[in-house]
Amino acid sequence: MSVLNLSKDSIKGMLVGVNFDAIKISAHQNREMISPPNNYIGDSFRIFVECGLNCVRIPFYWESFEKDPNGFIKELETISEEADKNGLMCIYDNHQWECSSFLGHGIGFPNSLLSIAFQRNPPNGDYWDPPIKIELKKFWSQWWDRKLANSENKDGWELQQDLLQIVIDKLDNKKSTLGFEILNEPQVFRSSDFKKVSNYHNFMVENLRYHTEKPLFFSYVFSNSIKAIDFPWRQSRTGPTTKINNKFIFDIHPYPPHYVVLLYYKLVSILMKNDMIFVGEFNAGIKKNVTVNSNQHLRYIKRFLDFSLYGATFWRWSYKPDNN
C-alpha cells in the first residue's frame, strides 16, 4: 500500500480506498486471534491518507458484537474519530464470510443463532477448516425462509436489524460516515432465493430509513449451487425495491476486475434500474499467494473510472494473515 501515490486528478472525484480489518469489531467468537501493533488504527489511517486514499470500508461482524459488545462499540467510536481526524469517508459493512466461525474458518453470524439449529463444526473445536457445504446450504436456505431464531424464538432478520440499528445510531452523525452496507455477500443455493434476498433487503431498509438518511449499500449475491446460477436477470432481482429517500448503491466484488466481469455487473445494474455501482472489494484474484503491484492497482482504478463507478475499496489492509 505504501507504494501508492494517488492524486485527486488521477481519481477524478471517485471514492478510492481499502477494506480495513479492525480488532474488536472483527473478532472471531470461537477462536482467538493475534494482537495488533500499537496504535494500529491511527497509524493505518494516516498511511491511507499519505497514499491518496479517501475512503475506507469497515467490515464489522455480528459474532464480534456478541463476543464483546462494549469493546465492539468502543472500537467503532475510535475508528470514526480517526476517520474524522484524517478526512476519510467510511462505509460500515455488516460482513460475513463463509457464514460463521461456529461452522468452520468463516466469520459473521453469532453463536446465539447457529447453536440452535446446528452442531458445532468440527466438534473437536478446530475452527480452521472450511465449513461443510451441506451445512452452509442448510443455513442459507433457513435464513431466506426466516426459519432461524435465537433461544427466545426471536427471528434472525429482526435480530440482525437490531444490530444494524445499534451501529447506525452510534455512527450516523459522524462527518466521516458515508453509509452502511446491509449484508456482505449473501449466498443462495436455490433459484427461488434470489427474490427472497430482495424481500430481506426490503425488510431491512423499511426500518433502517428511520435511523439514517445516508446511502444504503447492498451486496451482489454469491451463488453456491448449480441450481442457482446467477444469470444477470436473477441477480437483478436481489436488490431492495421499497421506495425510500435513501440512495441504494450496488456493491460488487470482482476478483479480478476484468472488463467482461464489470460488463456483467453493469448489465445487472441496468436491469435493476440502479446505475450506482460501488466496488466494495477487488484484488488480482482469490488464489493463495496472489500478488498485486501498484501498476496493476492503478490499471484497475482507471478501469473503474472508465465504467463511471461510484468508488472502489481494495481487499484488504490487515495485521493478520488472510486465510482467504
State where each predicted segment sits.
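N-terminal carbohydrate-binding accessory modules
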Residues: 1-55, 78-85, 89, 269-270
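Structural motif
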Residues: 13-15, 53-55, 87-89, 175-177, ...
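A cross-domain feature marking catalytic cores of carbohydrate-active enzymes
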Residues: 20-22, 58-62, 92-96, 181-184, ...
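Surface-exposed, active-site-proximal loop segments in enzymatic domains
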Residues: 26-33, 62-74, 101-114, 138-152, ...
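Extracellular glycoside hydrolase catalytic/binding regions
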Residues: 37-38, 148-310
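Aromatic-lined substrate-binding rim segments of carbohydrate-active enzymes
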Residues: 40-117, 167-171, 194-217, 297-307, ...
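Short catalytic/ligand-binding loop motif for oxyanion handling, primarily in non-cytosolic enzymes
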Residues: 64-67, 98-104, 108, 187-191, ...
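Aromatic-rich peripheral "rim/lid" segments of glycoside hydrolase catalytic domains that contact
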Residues: 78, 108-117, 125-144, 239-245, ...
